[in-house]
From Swiss-Prot:
The protein, known as: Bifunctional protein FolD
InterPro entries the record matches: Aminoacid_DH-like_N_sf (IPR046346), NAD(P)-bd_dom_sf (IPR036291), THF_DH/CycHdrlase (IPR000672), THF_DH/CycHdrlase_cat_dom (IPR020630), THF_DH/CycHdrlase_CS (IPR020867), THF_DH/CycHdrlase_NAD-bd_dom (IPR020631)
GO terms (BP aspect): L-histidine biosynthetic process; methionine biosynthetic process; purine nucleotide biosynthetic process; tetrahydrofolate interconversion
EC number: 1.5.1.5, 3.5.4.9
PANTHER family: C-1-TETRAHYDROFOLATE SYNTHASE, CYTOPLASMIC, C-1-TETRAHYDROFOLATE SYNTHASE, CYTOPLASMIC-RELATED
GO function terms (MF aspect): methenyltetrahydrofolate cyclohydrolase activity; methylenetetrahydrofolate dehydrogenase (NADP+) activity
Catalytic activity: (6R)-5,10-methylene-5,6,7,8-tetrahydrofolate + NADP(+) = (6R)-5,10-methenyltetrahydrofolate + NADPH; (6R)-5,10-methenyltetrahydrofolate + H2O = (6R)-10-formyltetrahydrofolate + H(+)
Pfam family name, one: THF_DHG_CYH_C
UniProt KW keywords: Amino-acid biosynthesis, Histidine biosynthesis, Hydrolase, Methionine biosynthesis, Multifunctional enzyme, NADP, One-carbon metabolism, Oxidoreductase, Purine biosynthesis
Any GO CC annotation of this UniProt entry: cytosol
Pathway: One-carbon metabolism; tetrahydrofolate interconversion
Self-association and partners: Homodimer.
Source species taxonomy: Bacteria, Bacillati, Bacillota, Bacilli, Lactobacillales
NADP is among the record's keywords: yes
Amino acid sequence: MVATILDGRMLSKKIRTNVSEKVSLLKQEGITPKLVVILVGEDPASQVYVRNKRKTAHALGIEAVDIRLPENVEEDELIRLIDELNSDGTVHGILVQLPLPKHINENKVTHRIIPEKDVDGFHPLNIGKLFMNIPGPLPCTPRGIMEFFKEYDIPVSGKRVVIVGRSNIVGRPMAALLVNSDATVTIAHSKTKNLAEVTKQADILIVAIGKGEFIDENYVKKGAVVIDVGMNRNNDGKLVGDVNMESVSKVASYITPVPGGVGPMTIAMLMKQTVELAERSVAGE
């Protein structure tokens, strides 16, 4: 068996085309969707992510504004800026690029964004809606992963899913989305005993642990669907996932590559969600 590649670049292009059409319709009503990204400090990876978001947004007709603040900015100043953006009627989505410097409380800052402009889907109210299966903004990476299942006709209902990683950005919201779609979900993490025994039970294995090429074929059931959320650099400086692609693609039925898998889908979902927030603001929701 050689795994079918779940092509995030191809699928994200399809989604971006749809987003672009929706932007055109909004502009006919005099509304330009606007996304504001706040970047604190000079983290090189964060700068690349922000640049990619801006470039993608502009290509789709979304107004994207970067606000760059120095590393030593006071938390109060950042909070004041978010308050201003919350009350600005022309802004539809607000995103604070993580990580933030140590002296700033990430939760306090991200929770300050009002739920109606929480384009990342991290506000406790939106997370609560997710767990109660009420529509609202969703964390972009889990939402992008669900799009793979839809596009490639991969059934989720009744399937056993193992998620390795319990972060608030991927693991936990991913579990909620899957439960809402009638999957049976296990979350594994660094304290899980006999990890391979757990992961080998998975019909769908989602890996988000930040350890380069950690998962090999010994962790994967034959015919499983494998979603690799990891982004790591190996010793040669090459971008790799948390899954050993060469090894696992021999046993999996489907697999996402790194790069070109989950990454492009996350940005596509961010754009889609920005436009959805603009649509909701027009509808007065």
